[in-house]
Curated annotation (Swiss-Prot):
EC number, UniProt record: 2.1.2.9
One Pfam entry name: Formyl_trans_C
Biological role: Attaches a formyl group to the free amino group of methionyl-tRNA(fMet). The formyl group appears to play a dual role in the initiator identity of N-formylmethionyl-tRNA by promoting its recognition by IF2 and preventing the misappropriation of this tRNA by the elongation apparatus.
GO terms under biological process: conversion of methionyl-tRNA to N-formyl-methionyl-tRNA
Identification of the protein by name: Methionyl-tRNA formyltransferase
UniProtKB keywords: Protein biosynthesis, Transferase
CC annotations in GO: cytosol
Domain of life: Bacteria
Primary gene name: fmt
Annotated positions binding (6S)-5,6,7,8-tetrahydrofolate: 109-112
InterPro entries: Fmt, Formyl_trans_C, Formyl_trans_C_sf, Formyl_transf_N, Formyl_transf_N_sf, Formyl_transferase-like_C_sf, Met-tRNA-FMT_N
Reactions mediated catalytically: L-methionyl-tRNA(fMet) + (6R)-10-formyltetrahydrofolate = N-formyl-L-methionyl-tRNA(fMet) + (6S)-5,6,7,8-tetrahydrofolate + H(+)
Similarity remark: Belongs to the Fmt family.
Keyword Oxidoreductase: no
Length: 311
C-alpha cells in the first residue's frame, strides 16, 4: 500500500480524493487544503469540500497559509508521493522534495497550453474544440513540469465552463489513479513539454465586462467561458446585468447602435454587436434577483426597452 499526502481544495479535488481514499492500493496519510473562507453575506465560515470530506472520514488534514509551515509535520509521515489537484496555493520546493516520487499534479488542459489557474475558463473563451487532462510533475515554474500522460477529449460547442467542469470532475479521478499507480510502479516514463506555452490565468474583474465590439463568435465564447462563475456582464441603465446564455441570430441589414436592443420576445433580448451582428440574450441576472430565463422576465416588470442600449 502506497502512502499519499493529498493537496487540494476544490470540488474537483474532493472527487479525486474520494476515489483515492476508497482505492485499496493507497493510504491517505494526510490532506493539505486551503484555510476556511468567510461568506461575506452571512459572515459564516465556509470549509472547502475537501475539508468537509476529511471531517466525514476522519482523515488528518492541515490548513496552512503557507505550505512550508507544515514541513516538519509532513516529513514525519514518510509518504511515497504527493498528489496535487486544484490546491490554489504555491508549494515550496522543500515540500516537493519530501516525497521520494515528488508531487504530481492533475491539470485540466493540453499542456503546454493554458498553464495557470483558470484553464477551464480559457478553454471555452478560446473556443477550443479539443482539450486534455494532463498529469505532470510539480516544479518551481508554474505548470511547466514533465508530463507522465495526457488524456485527450472533445469539447462540446454548447458547453460553458460549468459543463466543462462537470466533464473534468467525472473523468479526472480514474485517470489520476491510473497514472499514480503507473508512476509508483515505475511503468512508464516522463517526457518534457513540447511547444510554446500559453497561459490560462485567473479571470480578472475587468475581464468580466463583456465586449460588444467583438465578433459574435468571440462574444458568445466569453459568455460561455464566464458562466456560471463569475458571470460576464453588460451595463444597462447604470446596472450591471449578468449574461449567462446567448446565441447568434443573424446579421442585420439595418445600421444599429452598439448594444442596441432591436427586439424583445419570450425567446430572448436581441441586441446588436459590432458589424450589426445580432445575438439573442436568453438567460440573465438582474442585480438582487436570481438567474432567470428571459422568458420568465418579460412576463413581469422589467427595464428593457427596444432602442435602448447595453454598454
Amino acid at each position: 500500500m502506497f502512502k499519499i499526502v493529498f493537496f487540494g481544495t476544490s470540488t474537483l479535488s474532493k472527487k479525486c480524493l474520494e476515489q483515492l481514499f476508497y482505492d485499496n492500493d493507497f493510504e491517505i496519510c494526510a490532506v493539505v487544503t486551503q484555510p476556511d473562507k468567510i461568506n461575506h453575506r452571512n459572515n459564516k465560515i465556509v470549509p472547502s469540500d475537501v475539508k468537509s470530506f476529511c471531517l466525514e472520514k476522519n482523515i488528518t488534514f492541515f490548513q496552512p497559509k503557507q505550505s512550508i509551515s507544515i514541513k516538519a509535520d509532513l516529513e514525519k509521515l514518510k509518504a511515497d508521493i504527493g498528489i496535487c489537484v486544484s490546491f490554489g496555493q504555491y508549494l515550496h520546493q522543500d515540500i516537493i522534495d519530501l516525497f521520494p516520487n515528488k508531487v504530481i499534479n492533475l491539470h485540466p488542459s493540453k499542456l503546454p497550453l493554458l498553464r495557470g489557474g483558470a484553464p477551464l475558463h480559457w478553454t471555452i473563451i478560446n473556443g477550443f474544440k479539443k482539450s486534455a487532462l494532463s498529469v505532470i510533475q510539480l516544479v518551481k515554474k508554474m505548470d511547466a513540469g514533465p508530463i507522465w500522460k495526457q488524456q485527450d477529449f472533445l469539447v462540446n460547442n454548447d458547453w460553458n465552463t460549468g459543463d466543462l467542469s462537470i466533464y473534468v470532475e467525472e473523468h479526472s479521478p480514474s485517470f489520476l489513479i491510473e497514472c499514480t499507480k503507473e508512476i509508483l510502479n515505475k511503468k512508464g516514463k516522463w517526457f518534457e513539454q513540447i511547444g510554446e506555452p500559453t497561459f490560462g490565468l485567473n479571470i480578472r474583474k475587468e475581464q468580466e465586462h463583456l465586449d460588444l465590439n467583438q465578433i459574435y463568435k468571440s462574444f458568445l465564447n466569453w459568455v460561455k467561458g464566464l458562466a456560471p462563475k463569475p458571470g460576464g456582464w453588460l451595463s444597462f441603465e447604470g446596472k450591471n446585468i449578468k449574461i449567462f446564455k446567448a446565441k447568434y441570430v443573424s446579421k442585420s441589414n439595418y445600421k444599429h447602435q452598439l448594444g442596441e436592443i432591436v427586439n424583445i420576445s419570450r425567446k430572448g433580448i436581441n441586441i446588436a454587436l459590432k458589424s450589426n451582428e445580432i445575438i439573442s440574450i436568453e438567460k440573465i441576472q438582474i442585480p438582487g434577483k436570481r438567474v432567470m430565463e428571459v422568458s420568465e422576465i418579460i412576463n413581469g416588470k422589467h427595464p428593457f426597452v427596444v432602442g435602448k442600449c447595453f454598454k
